[in-house]
């Protein structure tokens, strides 16, 4: 089956690998040549991923039978709508359904309208004075969010990126003047986690839970990035998450998909809920209308099923199952020095693939070209899969040593110390649970 994959990051390399393993004849459109995908693809179209016309032309040329959309920007550009008009089914929501991610205000209002569990208190402002007055009256720490896509880097939280509510008002004013509107939310304290599901618009199949490390530097400090790494556990939960917490988070996504169908925006593809586990339970931080990056790499590394068959089930409305191995995973992203604010670009790195393989680790390429030249974003990920988290972390850590150049990574991704730190946060919030160190 001829399958088109849109996107060329680490997430897409992992998707492409799984599709080819499932028997797909792969064709890729991306704005750079990912060396991992180049080995997998029958043909590779270089084009802007949001240029719908170019993507459609490429799909026509090769007689594509199914498309799989990796990143969020093409979804916002209406790539799925255009492909479907061409008679090409796509794994990914339409432009209208993708608003769950692409328009944060719409998503919050949708949750409110449909009484979706895990909601946060929020307000949307287009008037600077009203916004300032409301924040003063509210008096508690807030979160400030632009309404559209920011690559995970536009959200600022009081007590983290913002010193206090005074700074929050300044930042919110800047967004109103730039975009016309701003979203203000209550701050929720706790530990974040990711739940991703496959859905055909009715049936919902959860994937193992994953925890991401968004901060650039060890100890969870520094600027927010696209994600410096992530881990998952062999029991598909996380050390601080009970079966009950998981069920509640899943209910949020199930009710979301049901409400989208009722509102006339059937949602098919991957839905990813970014949750905060608070003392009271899981609260939805935001929806994403596609796989997470790095989180896709974790779950696809343990997918014990055929991704091509799952993709067909999604587009045909006949989704049945998705099995995952009971293994732990650790993904460590390697980024250019200076990332995310001022990354080094244009310099080649050295990758000893044989050495990485001999350690039992796996390499996933991201923002490097076919010559392994740094393109300015996260360059590649090293993946460890094992029976225990400790062993998976050791494999990934050993694999990293075979990559040389002006790069950095977070040593603490998936380590026992960093996991225990998260368990401690939940205990301080009064959460009662029996931690498992997977």
UniProtKB/Swiss-Prot annotation:
- Whether Manganese counts among this entry's keywords is yes
Cofactor(s) recorded in Swiss-Prot or TrEMBL: Mg(2+); Mn(2+)
What InterPro entries does the database record attribute to this sequence?
ATP-grasp, ATP_grasp_subdomain_1, PreATP-grasp_dom_sf, PRibGlycinamid_synth_ATP-grasp, PRibGlycinamide_synth, PRibGlycinamide_synth_C-dom, PRibGlycinamide_synth_C_sf, PRibGlycinamide_synth_CS
Q: Does the keyword Manganese apply?
A: yes
Give the record's cofactor note, including how many are bound: Binds 2 magnesium or manganese ions per subunit.
Q: Where does Mg(2+) 1 bind?
A: 274, 286
Give the reaction(s) catalysed. 5-phospho-beta-D-ribosylamine + glycine + ATP = N(1)-(5-phospho-beta-D-ribosyl)glycinamide + ADP + phosphate + H(+)
Q: Which UniProt keywords apply?
A: ATP-binding, Ligase, Magnesium, Manganese, Metal-binding, Nucleotide-binding, Purine biosynthesis
Binding annotation for ATP = 135-194
What EC designation does it have?
6.3.4.13
Positions with a binding annotation for Mn(2+) 1: 274, 286
**Alphabetical list of Pfam families matching this protein:** GARS_A, GARS_C, GARS_N
* Family affiliation: Belongs to the GARS family.
Protein's UniProt name: Phosphoribosylamine--glycine ligase
The species is Pyrococcus horikoshii (strain ATCC 700860 / DSM 12428 / JCM 9974 / NBRC 100139 / OT-3)
Higher taxonomy:
Archaea, Methanobacteriati, Methanobacteriota, Thermococci, Thermococcales
- Gene expressing this chain: purD
């Amino acid at each position: 089956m001829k399958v088109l994959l849109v996107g060329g990051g680490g997430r897409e390399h992992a998707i492409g690998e799984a599709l080819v393993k499932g028997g797909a004849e792969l064709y890729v459109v991306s704005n750079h040549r990912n060396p991992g995908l180049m080995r997998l693809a029958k043909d590779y179209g270089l084009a802007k991923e949001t240029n719908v016309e170019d993507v459609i032309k490429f799909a026509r040329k090769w007689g594509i039978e199914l498309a799989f959309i990796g990143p969020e920007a093409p979804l916002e550009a209406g790539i799925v709508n255009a492909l479907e008009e061409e008679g090409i089914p796509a794994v990914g929501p339409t432009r209208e359904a993708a608003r769950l991610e692409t328009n944060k205000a719409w998503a919050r209002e949708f949750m409110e309208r449909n009484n979706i569990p895990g909601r946060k208190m929020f307000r949307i402002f287009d008037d600077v004075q009203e916004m300032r007055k409301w924040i003063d009256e509210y008096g508690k720490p807030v979160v400030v969010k632009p309404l559209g896509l920011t690559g995970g880097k536009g959200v600022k939280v009081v007590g983290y990126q913002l010193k206090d509510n005074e700074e929050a008002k300044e930042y919110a004013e800047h967004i109103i003047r730039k975009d016309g509107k701003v979203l203000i939310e209550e701050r929720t304290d706790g530990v974040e986690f990711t739940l991703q599901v496959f859905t055909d618009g009715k049936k919902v199949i959860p994937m193992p839970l994953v925890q991401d490390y968004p901060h650039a530097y060890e100890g969870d400090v520094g600027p927010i990035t696209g994600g410096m790494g992530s881990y998952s556990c062999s029991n598909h939960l996380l050390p601080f998450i009970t079966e009950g917490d998981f069920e509640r988070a899943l209910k949020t996504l199930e009710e979301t998909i049901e409400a989208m169908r009722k509102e006339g925006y059937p949602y098919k593809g991957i839905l990813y809920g970014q949750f905060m586990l608070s003392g009271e339970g899981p609260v939805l931080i935001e929806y994403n209308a596609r796989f997470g990056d790095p989180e896709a790499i974790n779950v696809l590394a343990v997918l014990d099923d055929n991704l091509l068959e799952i993709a067909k089930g999604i587009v045909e409305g006949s989704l049945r199952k998705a099995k995952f191995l009971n293994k732990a995973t650790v993904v460590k992203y390697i980024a250019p020095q200076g990332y995310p604010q001022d990354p080094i670009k244009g310099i080649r790195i050295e990758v000893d693939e044989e050495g990485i393989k001999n350690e039992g680790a796996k390499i996933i390429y991201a923002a490097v070209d076919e010559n392994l030249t740094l393109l300015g974003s996260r360059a590649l990920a090293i993946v460890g899969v094992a029976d225990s988290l400790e062993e998976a972390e050791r494999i990934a850590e050993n694999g990293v040593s075979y990559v040389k150049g002006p790069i950095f990574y977070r040593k603490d991704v998936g380590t026992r110390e960093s996991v225990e730190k998260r368990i401690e946060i939940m205990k301080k919030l009064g959460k009662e649970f029996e931690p498992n160190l997977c």
